[in-house]
Amino acid sequence: MKYQGSCHCGSIKFVAEGELSEVLSCNCSICQKKGSLLWFLSSKQVKISLETSENLANYTFNKHVINHHFCKMCGIHPYAQGTDAKGNAIFAINVRCIDDMDLEKIKINYFDGRSA
């Protein structure tokens, strides 16, 4: 199934394709503060479109292996990019940014990112 979403102001939009049955809630320092619910997909399953690249900002911390992208205009974090354990490019879509998402229907798995 295809899902569309964006930041709050619409400057950063995405289309993600896959089966969305469960997401990850992480308690690491950044996820805890952002409140993201993450859906992990391969880079082939996600298409990003930008109103202008000037509105896309990136934040990295700790080991600097995950690019946490956010909108400079509205401050929303719609997705992050990185690599999985096998070196494949992946996206972590914040499902809270998907249009008309009913979070009640999705299983939430909790991950102890503070201890990882």
Summary of predicted features, one role per range:
Residues 1-6, 11-116:
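A short Gly-Trp-Pro
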